[in-house]
Amino acid sequence: MSIKTVKDFNSFAGKRALVRCDFNVPLKEGNISDDTRIKAALPTIEYLKEKGARIVLISHLGRPEGKKNLKYSLKPVANKLSELLGQDVKMLSDCIGREIVNNTLQMKDGDVVLLENVRFYAEEEKNDKNFAKKLSENGDVFVNDAFGAAHRAHASTVGVSDYLPSVGGFLMEKEDKFLGEVLKNPERPFVSIIGGSKVSSKIAVLESLLSKSNVVVIGGGMAYTFLHSKGYSIGKSLLESEYIDIASSFLKKAKELDVKVILPLDHIVADDFNKNSTPEYIDSFDIPENKIGMDVGGKTLKEIEKVIKTAKTIIWNGPLGVFEFDSFSKGTAMVAEMVASCAGLTIVGGGDSVAAVNKFNLSDKITHVSTGGGASLEYLEGKILPGIKVLEK
């Protein structure tokens, strides 16, 4: 099912386009430390400007818990947008109310304003109808380009669409196209690389991708629960004991479906979970009882490289080791390079895998770098995202 996009809307000229973006960017001492999500919104903003729209941007930032907290103000985003667009992006002091609506009504074609954080109101996350109606008064048409928040049925992602004609922006369209393609009709061989620390947060994705993949690579902290379920010793590594049976039945199902599962065959371990710990190589599935698994070893990487080289489609979500500690980031870094050099369709999603791709300047070699963390996960789990559902044709 495809979605309606900005190209399906007749005329934006002179109209206020209320654009829901995902400007939930990391801030360090009030400065934006990664502007990927802001840059991802630019194609839609530029298109609307070209078409003569008056652009009213809305977003959330952080978790202010329904109260006005200037620590979570979108002011730094307005400054960054002004710089990137080469025009003044006016920051308004609220997101609802007569004064704000009057400001939007006085805009000229091509003007861009940013409203204050929608999560300064508790009604936003409750998808309160009255709040959604007040938000909608700032626009004549609603454009949802916030894929990163599409899995949330909030007032600014879903509620507003009850009051305004609604279409998706280019980012929303791109995410829906690439992730949808992978789930519906992937070119084969199709390799899913799933990392991260917990089985509990990734098991639904693994189960959804299992029936579609030819190879599933499991890495990161969650791999140790899978190894334990096969009878290997994992030392002091992370173990989710309540998921041992689930891991075991997943591996059994993979065998029945003739899907190859790659688990770590060797490890980089440490005495304790610390960025200053000394890395030590273990050439075995088994980890000594006083050690913690921190990254995959060279043999595992060679196995992964073999399947990546012949892959026609790759989806990668989650790191293969403790990526945030430099000494244990090699596995994730090498997989990032392997995925980037693959000639097939490559999709990377999830905070740490995206960070790895960006850190090594490889994002332009990936077919699609997904901007949605939780949203990408839920999409890959096969869930219908509320923010996308309201845009379907």
Curated annotation (Swiss-Prot):
Disulfide bonds: none annotated. InterPro entries: Phosphoglycerate_kinase, Phosphoglycerate_kinase_N, Phosphoglycerate_kinase_sf. It is an enzyme of class 2 (transferase). Its EC number is 2.7.2.3. GO terms for cellular component: cytosol. Coiled coil: none annotated. It is found in: Cytoplasm. It holds the Pfam family PGK. ATP binds at K202, G293, E324, G350, G351, D352, S353. Its main location: cytoplasm. One of its GO terms (biological process) is glycolytic process. It catalyses: (2R)-3-phosphoglycerate + ATP = (2R)-3-phospho-glyceroyl phosphate + ADP. Signal peptide: none annotated. Monomer. PANTHER family: PHOSPHOGLYCERATE KINASE, PHOSPHOGLYCERATE KINASE 1, CHLOROPLASTIC-RELATED. This is Phosphoglycerate kinase. The gene is pgk.
